[in-house]
Curated annotation (Swiss-Prot):
Keywords assigned: Amidation, Disulfide bond, Ion channel impairing toxin, Knottin, Neurotoxin, Secreted, Signal, Toxin
Cited function: Moderate insecticidal toxin with probable ion channel impairing activity. In vivo, induces irreversible paralysis in sheep blowflies (L.cuprina), leading to death at moderate doses (9.7 nmol/g).
Tissue expr: Expressed by the venom gland.
Organism in which the protein naturally occurs: Hadronyche infensa (Fraser island funnel-web spider)
GO molecular function: ion channel regulator activity; toxin activity
Any GO CC annotation of this UniProt entry: extracellular region
Organism lineage string: Eukaryota, Metazoa, Ecdysozoa, Arthropoda, Chelicerata
Listed name of the protein: U4-hexatoxin-Hi1a
Pfam family, one: Cys_Knot_tox
Length: 96
């Protein structure tokens, strides 16, 4: 009985500590670019980091345009991402 209780407590703590992060945890500023278009949201295809939306808190997070494998895994594509410096949480882990 104690073993079952310990396993349940350990599982609950693991879920709390390792919970699945959502893409909305790193907020970004959706602004208009100098060319009149709006910045690209995370997971959208891009050619340079200047096209991607910047995070609100630039000291705790960074943005960029990087190559990732999409779900179909045919070839790598460039997508916008925003990452949290402290948690290494990125909003573009898998392509959509």
């Amino acid at each position: 009985m104690k073993l079952i209780l310990l396993i349940a407590i350990f599982s609950a703590l693991a879920v709390v500590n390792l919970g699945t992060p959502s893409a909305d945890q790193v907020r970004y500023n959706y602004t208009e670019l100098p060319n009149g278009e709006y910045c690209y949201t995370p997971r959208r295809r891009c050619t340079s980091a200047d096209q991607c939306c910047r995070p609100y808190d630039t000291t705790a997070a960074f943005h960029g345009c990087g190559r990732i494998w999409p779900k179909d895994k045919r070839e790598k594509v460039d997508r916008c991402y925003i990452c949290n410096n402290e948690k290494t949480l990125c909003t573009s882990v898998m392509g959509k």
